[in-house]
Structure formats: C-alpha cells, structure tokens
C-alpha cells in the first residue's frame, strides 16, 4: 500500500511544486503516504499529523513531540526566507528535517519527497539515492555539521545518474 501511496505523493509534489512549502503540504504528504496502511490502524499513530510519542534515528534522539510544531515552523520560516535556493540549502533543510523527525514513521520518505519538491521548485536537477550510494548518503547526513561536502558530493553523483536518464529520454534540464 505504501508503494502505491508513494506514487500518489510524487503526483502531489509535481502538481504543487510551484507552491510555497508549508506545514499543511508536509502533513498532507504524510497523510497520502500512510493512509490505509497498518500504521493508520494504530490509535497512537497520527496519520497526517506530527508524532505523539518520542522516537529516535540510529540511536540518536529527535525533537520532543511537544516541540515539533515550533521546530517545524522555525525550519520552514528560515527556508522560506531564502531568496535563492541551491543544492546545499535543500540538503540542509533535509538534514534539519530528519533531526526533528516530525512524524512517528515515514520521515525519510517524506524528507526525500520534500527534496524532490525543492529541486523542482528551484530548477535544481533532482536525484535519486541508489543502493550503491546509500552508505555515502548516510555518512553525509551524520557528518553534515562537520563536513557537508560528503552529502553534497553524494547527491551531485546521484544528480549525474539522473541527468543520464534525462539525456537518454531527450528531456532537457
């Protein structure tokens, strides 16, 4: 079900890529992703809303559920103040989003959908993290504050793969 829902999310991103990124859009993506899944049957799981219970990523704590709305509001305010958005801005938003980890589950998928949205919105060639790049990608996220080049270089490589596909299908970028 989540695979079908993920395609619905991609359609939503494409349809709304020129819209300003808002909490409403982000929550709607989560609702699209998690509707009619086993998670949606759990009374403690908030489909389309922020987490109710604390969670962690790779053993690291994330934002307390009571603070998520405030943190997301601040993240979006800072992002939406940018006059011109580049790849590093998109990646920084993603890393901060992952650290907040606003939803009980699905944060990585929602975060990657948001990067796709931001790339489309800002005329940045999108990218897909393939299995062969996953370790470098995860290392880049973990080391973002010290050496953001790890993640940037990994995503630039992924962009090169994406460009090859665009060229193959004669799609201008």
Task: List the predicted regions and their residue ranges.
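FIC/Doc superfamily catalytic core
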Residues: 1-105, 109-173
